[in-house]
Structures are given as C-alpha cells and as structure tokens.
Amino acid sequence: MKVLEGGLAAPNAKVAVVVARFNSFINDSLVEGAVDALKRIGQVKDENITLVRVPGAYELPLAVRRLADSKKYDAIVALGTVIRGGTAHFEYVAGGASNGIGHVSLESNVPVAFGVLTTENIEQAIDRAGTKSGNKGAEAALVALEMVNLLAQINA
C-alpha cells in the first residue's frame, strides 16, 4: 500500500502570512509562532516569507485570494482572532472569514491554512496564542508546509 503524507521541512517554499490587525495584541503572538515554525521547523528562508496585514478578519479572504491568484506563493497562512461579543457580529465575521478562506484554497489549489481563532472570550484567545493551548499560528504554519509537501507528492 502506498501512503502519501507531507513532511514539515520545505526550505524552498514561498509562504505568505496574512494577519488581521484587529485584536493585534493576540494576533502578533500568532504571527510570531507562525514565522518561528516556518523558519525553525520548516527551514523556510526569511526572504521566502511575506507578511501581509489587513484591517480585520473579514478582510482576510480577499487578500488571501489575491495572493493565491498571483501564483507567487506555495502556501498561505491566514491568521486572526474573532472574539464573541453581545451581538450577532461574531457569526458574520467568523463565518465570512472561514467560508471565504476555504473557498480560496479549493478554487486556487494553493494550500491556505486557517489560523483564525474564534473564541468566546479574550482568555480563550490568549490561551491559543501561545500560552496554555499552544500557538495556533505555529500550528497553521505547519499545516501549510505539510500540505505543500503532500500536494507535491500527489502531483509527482
């Protein structure tokens, strides 16, 4: 039986990291985790990483789409934080970001890793940005690299 599974090292991969500025006190930690994982575990060169900042999580899909359409990147990591408030705004933003990012990956055939935190409160977001629950930015970066390597195997 042949088993295909992507590894994490991708030293020649070109990766875009797209991050929302809104909730930057959390998102900055996600970026640090993602970039650290790309460089340290994935062995991606600094010059092959592009950081793109957008206003908020709702704007992530459009920027991700443009980056995917440019054909300059082997993978894209989308990072942000949406914290539930007292209105339905959470559902619109979280759903729009999630659906939009997912569509880009499927339509462009470029791996887009979803590293957008959708939490009930600030404490949960902080936990997932590098404290109790690990760093979801780092996890998303590793997913992106694994998919780059897996797709290369599938196409070989």
UniProtKB/Swiss-Prot annotation:
GO terms for cellular component: cytosol; riboflavin synthase complex. (2S)-2-hydroxy-3-oxobutyl phosphate binds at residues 86-87, 128. The keyword Transferase applies. The keyword Transferase applies. It catalyses: (2S)-2-hydroxy-3-oxobutyl phosphate + 5-amino-6-(D-ribitylamino)uracil = 6,7-dimethyl-8-(1-D-ribityl)lumazine + phosphate + 2 H2O + H(+). It holds the Pfam family DMRL_synthase. Pathway: Cofactor biosynthesis; riboflavin biosynthesis; riboflavin from 2-hydroxy-3-oxobutyl phosphate and 5-amino-6-(D-ribitylamino)uracil: step 1/2. Its EC number is 2.5.1.78. InterPro entries: LS, LS/RS, LS/RS_sf. Signal peptide: none annotated. One of its GO terms (biological process) is riboflavin biosynthetic process. NCBIfam families: lumazine-synth, PRK00061.1-4. Belongs to the DMRL synthase family. This is 6,7-dimethyl-8-ribityllumazine synthase. It comes from Mannheimia succiniciproducens (strain KCTC 0769BP / MBEL55E).
